[in-house]
């Protein structure tokens, strides 16, 4: 049995199938872990969702910000943006089944010594705390009507964790930290304006995994979301978003002692022009 973590697919279904051929994926004995953002911006969101859902227990995924955006559009809270490419999902005959499956995916997934999350774990939390906080959001998403949550999840505040946070502010921080975070200041305050590669940000900001006095996560964090960072192997974290959508690669990491990396190039040189507005 082999376990592979795979970076942001974002509807790049053809590349996903090529990657699975490369690693010789066998759903009868292997397992896939996806870092979220299964949909949007790429050409085949519907095929991607159907395929991954159809893998059953052979696959697990966490929710990414694009997945949440799809849910918000589907329930009428948000509008389709000009770069969105998930109209095929919204018009599909099995739309309701796919969306019901998607909204019951976790924000954090633990697999042995690995912790899978879309954007990262904020500096004030370890993996166990992240699982508990994620559970608060997951309970709301699984409860039925998610209109209220989708309406309230947008916004950049609060940007600093406190155990005293309550209500929508608390849920918004949890969601933002786990699905949108890249940079923090040295106190752990989240910054959502800077989206480029490390080295281009203001001196007051550092990647979330480099914040001084960051709480040890107690697990190896596997994340995506940050395509301008690309493949990154830190002391206790790995970034697997290698920008397939923008003409880069789709990456898989074998979660064993070797941590062998596999990648396939984007087809057609990418599906959209690179942007820092992901």
UniProtKB/Swiss-Prot annotation:
EC top class named in words: hydrolase
One function term, GO molecular function aspect: bis(5'-nucleosyl)-tetraphosphatase (symmetrical) activity
Reactions catalysed, as given in the entry: P(1),P(4)-bis(5'-adenosyl) tetraphosphate + H2O = 2 ADP + 2 H(+)
EC number(s) given by UniProt: 3.6.1.41
Cross-referenced CDD domains: MPP_ApaH
Highest taxon in the source lineage: Bacteria
Protein keywords: Hydrolase
Matching HAMAP family: ApaH
NCBIfam families: apaH (TIGR00668), PRK00166.1 (NF001204)
Family per similarity comment: Belongs to the Ap4A hydrolase family.
Protein role: Hydrolyzes diadenosine 5',5'''-P1,P4-tetraphosphate to yield ADP.
Name the UniProt record assigns to this protein: Bis(5'-nucleosyl)-tetraphosphatase, symmetrical
């Amino acid at each position: 049995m082999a376990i592979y973590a795979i970076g942001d697919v974002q509807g790049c279904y053809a590349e996903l199938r090529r990657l699975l051929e490369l690693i010789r994926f066998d759903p009868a004995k292997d397992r896939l872990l996806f870092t979220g953002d299964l949909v949007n911006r790429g050409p085949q969101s519907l095929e991607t969702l159907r395929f991954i859902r159809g893998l059953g227990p052979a696959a697990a995924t966490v929710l990414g910000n694009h997945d949440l955006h799809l849910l918000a559009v589907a329930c009428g809270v948000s509008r389709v943006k000009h770069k969105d490419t998930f109209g095929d999902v919204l018009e599909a005959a099995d739309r309701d089944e796919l969306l019901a499956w998607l909204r019951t995916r976790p924000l954090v997934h633990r697999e042995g010594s690995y912790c899978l999350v879309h954007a990262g774990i904020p500096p004030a939390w370890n993996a166990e705390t992240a699982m508990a906080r994620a559970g608060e959001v997951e309970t709301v998403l699984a409860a039925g009507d998610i209109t209220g949550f989708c309406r309230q999840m947008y916004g950049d505040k609060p940007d600093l964790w406190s155990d005293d946070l309550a209500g929508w502010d608390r849920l918004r921080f949890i969601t933002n930290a786990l699905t949108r975070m890249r940079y923090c200041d040295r106190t752990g305050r989240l910054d959502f304006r800077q989206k480029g590669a490390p080295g281009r940000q203001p001196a007051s900001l550092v990647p979330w995994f480099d914040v001084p006095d960051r709480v040890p996560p107690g697990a190896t964090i596997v994340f995506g979301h940050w395509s301008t960072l690309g493949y990154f192997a830190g002391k206790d974290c790995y970034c697997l978003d290698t920008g397939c959508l923008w003409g880069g690669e789709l990456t898989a990491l074998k979660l064993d002692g070797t941590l062998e990396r596999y990648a396939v190039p984007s087809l057609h040189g990418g599906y959209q022009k690179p942007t820092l507005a992901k």
